[in-house]
Design a protein with these regions (language model features):
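Segments forming oxygen-rich coordination pockets for charged ligands
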Residues: 1-171, 204, 210-213, 248-260
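Glycine-rich Rossmann-fold phosphate-binding loop(s) that bind the pyrophosphate
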Residues: 136-137, 177, 234
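A generic structural signal for alpha->beta connector loops
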Residues: 151, 193, 221-222
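Adenosine-phosphate binding glycine-rich loop
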Residues: 199-260
């Protein structure tokens, strides 16, 4: 059972609306309490992308600052967070300071008179990175089929598609193979993606890039295009080329997370 299935209908509707709008959110669940606390294990809240509580309840205001900080960390790193909001004297007994992490737990000070401890698990839900595959070539079809298993939101489009800006990560693979290459590049460059890859030889891209810059394309953006697309695995068949491209995309996505 997923967290959304354990929430009320109102909360589930809010989750669905956030997903439809490609907005990040997080579930916060109290998993353990010690001493006197307002909220008990099992209490849940839905957190917005700024870390504030949209719906639900986690007790009084003593834990809100720690929850917000942990939620922002979860969104930035795409990793769940476990926080323990603990009275200062208990932190001293444990030999940890507020703000430090030990054993996978981030500790925060609870200054409330109740002197209780609340452990809260925060699980982020981020929009899947978008993979836009331009063209209907065999490589394009193989890439769409293979990438579906690797947590990408896939869009298979024609070369003349209008790519609207998006807040999520976007990777564009141009696999038009001579059928509207320039049109596809103009659409891809205008959308400001995290990466543009071109399925074609470096010689062919050199000719296309000159045409693009002569027509007014930003030289820096053109030079940032990865051509030929994919890691060098001596790929020959469309499936092998698609595999090399997907490996490069996964490497790029993981590198982006490691930088935060």
């Amino acid at each position: 059972m997923t967290p959304a299935e354990m929430l009320s209908r109102e909360l589930t509707e809010k989750v669905d609306a956030l997903r439809a709008a490609d907005k990040p959110f997080a579930f916060a669940t109290i998993v353990r309490t010690v001493g006197s606390t307002a909220a008990k294990p099992g209490a849940k809240a839905l957190l917005a992308e700024d870390g504030t509580i949209l719906e639900g309840w986690l007790g009084g205001g003593c834990a809100r600052g720690a929850v917000k900080r942990a939620a922002l960390t979860a969104f930035r790193t795409a990793e769940p967070q476990l926080i323990s909001v603990t009275p200062e004297e208990f932190l001293a007994e444990l030999g940890v300071e507020a703000g430090t992490q030990h054993g996978g737990v981030t500790y925060a000070r609870n200054g409330c008179p109740s002197k209780g401890t609340v452990d809260i698990f925060i699980e982020p839900s981020l929009p899947l990175p978008e993979l836009v595959v331009m063209g209907a070539s065999p490589v394009a079809k193989a890439l769409c089929s293979l990438a579906a298993q690797f947590q990408f939101a896939i869009r298979a489009v024609e070369a003349d598609v209008d790519l609207l800006p998006t807040s999520r990560q976007r990777y564009v693979v141009i696999a038009t193979q001579g059928q509207g290459d320039i049109v596809a590049f103009n659409a891809a460059l205008a959308s400001g993606p995290s990466l543009i890859s071109f399925v074609g030889s470096s010689r062919k891209f050199a000719a296309l890039s000159q045409k693009l810059m002569d027509a007014g394309a930003d030289p820096a953006a053109v030079r940032s295009v990865k051509a030929p697309a994919g890691l060098n695995i001596n790929a020959v068949t469309p499936d092998e080329i698609a595999l090399s491209i997907l490996a490069e995309l996964v490497k790029q996505r993981r590198a982006a997370r490691a930088e935060v």
